Amino acid sequence: MSYQQPQLSGPLQRETDSSDRESLISGHEHGGKSSQSAAVFNVVNSVIGSGIIGLPYSMKQAGFPLGILLLFLVSYITDFSLVLLIKGGALSGTDSYQSLVNKTFGFPGYLLLSTLQFMYPFIAMISYNIITGDTLSKVFQRLPGVDPGGWFISRHFIIVVSTVTCTLPLSLYRDIAKLGKISFISTILTTVILGIVMTRAISLGPNIPKTDNAWVFAKPNAIQAIGVMSFAFICHHNCFLVYGSLEEPTVAKWRRIIHTSILVSVFICVLFATCGYFTFTGFTQGDLFENYCRSDDLVTFGRFCYGITVILTYPIECFVTREVIANVFFGGTLSSVFHTVLAVLIVTAATLVSLMIECLGIVLELNGVLCAAPLIFIIPSACYLKLSEEPRTHSDKIMACVMFPVGAVVMVVGFVMAITNPQDCTHGQEMFYCFPENVSFTNTSWSHLQLTT
């Protein structure tokens, strides 16, 4: 987009409430064309994207009561850091995350941010391939006359075919605007999926035994759970685009938009995480759809919707990775031939890695702790602390001082725990409660089931 952030009059040494109400792009006479409601929709869609499928798993990792508290905490920090980024842009006179970090920490900071902004969507592409293979393989198994054990409906074959026929061609577009309708379609499909998860929480949940520690307050893997939540909530890479698209954008207006967006998003996320975890408790997988029985046609439809959602979202992530490489190494300009070659190389690399990984949970954890956590917790707070001349007792500075070490702990400890204490998954296996002899589990203890299944 052509919007430019002008230099502000004065260094903004004191960001008071009155200055927050002033336009931060006063040099841009007309601003963008997006309404506040459209901006809210864009932010909500960014948050409740494909990462929402792992939120019930994060409840299993952290313990349900602590997991809900952590979900609210991550949402609050996301809210705060999104506002902090725009304030940092105002202080530095920049209009993008990259230019903000470059202005604040120079070229080394720019390279670090670029690395994170490449890694996050690239690992997301890997997770999308895993989800596509897991979900669509079970969809095709329900088709009449299809051999459930056939190689042509195996997850590996489906990943390769969906890549060649769908995600790669879509990833070759040079203009991301051509993918503009994807966000609306994805939001509709995500709403359908939420409805299915809620329905099965009521109809299926009471028939599945609860594990012994299902309602324990906290579990040792809470740090990894924060990583999964961070993966779901991150939308910082496009906040400057949304802000710049507003008519007469101001910090006060942006703050209202973010508060509304995060409030809606956290309501949906808590509902999804609660319904998913209540249904399966300690059996919850990183990919929630792995928990449902293959014979459940309603869930099969949900799998189809989710598979389509991630296929449509995949090209956007590829666009980001390609743009990062183009900006860092080629000055932002690629020839048509090299654009195609680079897209093919990125998609091929993501596909090869996804074929070697079975469990979605570890991918969500690593992407959350290695990429999402620094992009949400560390970098926004570091930029603001260096740029702002507010007193140390100012509430924003206090919060930024808390966010920075918390993000560092989540990143380091979460990575170590994800590697040294990986969680098992039952990829490709039918869960025990799906077999005919276990049709009803009401008033049945889990310890008894362990002896009989």
UniProtKB/Swiss-Prot annotation:
Protein transport as UniProt keyword: no
Glycan-linked positions: 438, 443
GO biological process: amino acid transport; sodium ion transport
Location in or out of the cell: Membrane
InterPro entries reported for this sequence: AA_transpt_TM
Pfam family, any one: Aa_trans
Basic and acidic residues bias (residue ranges): 14-32
Residues of the signal peptide: none
Membrane-related topology note: Multi-pass membrane protein
Cellular component aspect of the GO annotation: membrane
Bias kind Polar residues: ranges: 1-10
Membrane-traversing stretches: 39-59, 66-86, 106-126, 150-170, 179-199, 222-242, 262-282, 299-319, 337-357, 359-379, 398-418
PANTHER family tied to this protein: AMINO ACID TRANSPORTER, SODIUM-COUPLED NEUTRAL AMINO ACID TRANSPORTER 11-RELATED
Name listed for the protein in its UniProt record: Putative sodium-coupled neutral amino acid transporter 11
Lineage of the species this protein comes from: Eukaryota, Metazoa, Chordata, Craniata, Vertebrata
